[in-house]
A protein has these predicted regions:
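Catalytic core of pol beta-like nucleotidyltransferases
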Residues: 1-37, 44-156
Length: 156
């Protein structure tokens, strides 16, 4: 596979935003670390899993398989010859991943030059910070309140 242009990646994410409303790009494409072997990682709240699976049954995807990573699914999008990794998260984790991704993007840390294990350690620390602050507050009905800059879809 080739590394996709960010415009194309965002078009793909926007397609899923129209289906499931709340999702955002995460992983190597989000953090400017994509290689020719990279999947497009998209995070969703767990409530979006059934609607997404239903949608995938209607479009041209191949190699649909369940992933043990956060109740996810992995599939190949034939139209762009790219594998998509859909990650489904509890609303609290969804909010924390979103906040952590924004924090990492806003930091001055050269993420694309970090070793994989160093990046993953930093990512886990960033996810833990908001989780410590809001862990007793986030539910499946109010999680959007904690993502005030996500207006009807994705913000990168």
């Amino acid at each position: 596979m080739n590394i996709l242009e960010m415009q194309k990646v965002n078009e793909i994410v926007n397609t899923f935003t129209q289906v499931c409303q709340d999702c955002f790009l995460t992983g190597s494409y989000r953090f400017n670390r994509a290689s020719k072997d990279s999947d497009i990682d998209i995070a969703f709240p767990i409530m979006a899993k059934a609607p997404l699976i239903e949608y995938l049954a209607k479009i041209n995807v191949t190699e649909l398989e369940h992933s043990h990573y956060n109740a996810g699914v992995k599939f190949h999008l034939a139209t762009v010859d790219q594998t998509i990794n859909a990650v489904f998260l509890h609303p609290l984790d969804f909010v924390c991943w979103y906040i952590a991704a924004n924090m990492l993007n806003a930091s001055n840390v050269p993420l694309n030059n970090m070793a994989r294990h160093d990046f993953h350690a930093l990512h886990q620390i960033m996810i833990s910070l908001p989780k410590m602050m809001i862990r007793d507050c986030v539910t499946s009905t109010n999680y959007k309140e904690f993502m005030s800059d996500m207006k009807n879809g994705q913000k990168i």
